Amino acid sequence: MVSIFLNIYTVRNINFIRKHTMSLNIKHIENEIIDQYLYDENPTRPWIIGFSGGKDSTMLLQMVWNALKKIDTAVFQRPVYVVCNDTLVENPKIVLFIEETLKQIQEAANKQSLNIQVVKTTPRLEDTFWVNLIGKGYPAPNKFYRWCTDRLKINPTTRFILEQIGEKGEAIILLGTRSDESRSRAASIKRHEVKGQRLRKHVLPNAYVYAPIKDILTEDLWQYLLQNPPPWGGTHRDLITLYRNATGGDCPLVIDTTTPSCGQSRFGCWVCTVVKKDKSMDALIDNGEEWMEPLQELRDFLVETRDTPEVYREKRRRDGSEKEGMWGPYKLEVRAEILKRLLKAQKEIQQTEGIELITHQEMVLIQYHWFRDCFFKTKVSQIYNRIFTNKIDMSKQEEKYKQEAELLKKSCKQEPKDVELIQDLLALQKTKTLMIRKRGLQADIDNRLNQYIEELNLPVYMN
């Protein structure tokens, strides 16, 4: 009986000490944030808060918000940006949650007269996942070849940071990274921090990193969120439910190669093939989000295409070289198959969720790259129109093209094979209107001519 009493007494004491210690830590961090904001050697450099909608960045933003409320913002008008990067292939369930949260943040900041502005960054059209994978034939990423991280995550945010540095001279990036999150995260923080200083230099010139909650434990973080509703309104109930259903952490704002990308059970891109299994998607499906099953099936197919290059990829690389064990881009018919599966998945989930997986602009650029790779037999619009009832026409001059085709047939009566060649060359020429840079067009035309000569079994003459 005495031992039971002592155990209960000990547990209560531990909980009291933990709660008291956490409250002291929170107060200390808030005071530190206020001090950094007010007494910075450069009071004009903006704060850029990396926000992913997950638990770490949510706590960071909430603490900064509460600190700013204690400052006379009429006197101190340092701009604060809440930057959220959308790769355009994020887990759709997370996208819906984040979009609503960002809307609440901006509305509340305006009402509370806080100099906070929400900014959403996205990759350039030519850098999107589908343009590179389906258009150019880039293989699904793995841990050794993560071509997606720079294009989808680092570059969009970097462009915004550089814009602010160009305008203000310097910028401070606030991140929700924590040592307790993982061993690799702890090692990264320790490796880059400067002892005795709050800020560390970022890889970008005139940019600095500030991680106010780096020493907060995960248990304390959840306790804080459970006890303190977000100052922008509502509760953290939806956030907690997401974690409960997906059993994972959140993706950090990736600003350089030292920041770990998402994997294991973390929320991230639904197309991510860096890991074998997407545990967060599996868990969401198991917890009632069955509409995500088509996405899971497509992701698993991408893993298959990556793991069996001898089936799905060209032997020859883009530079024309061939080497044992070194594979080229996806075969053209494989790219068409991936697009077909993607559009079928989009049609299926749009019936219940209304989510768009690929944009019209991306499909136009994919067609451009297919033309450049001399893939003319199958067109993007043909694949789309077989799946959807609302047809798309990528050629506003379709009637003109038909007239051109008839004229070509008449002109090439004696050499009917030349009709296809000339049509392909015209298609290549027309695609240049899609891109600002026309570099490589002459090489594309030369490649098509050489391909035609090879089909006729004639000797190929290289310049």
What residue ranges belong to the model's regions?
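Nucleotide-activated chemistry modules centered on ATP-dependent adenylation/adenylyltransferase
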Residues: 2-48, 55-463
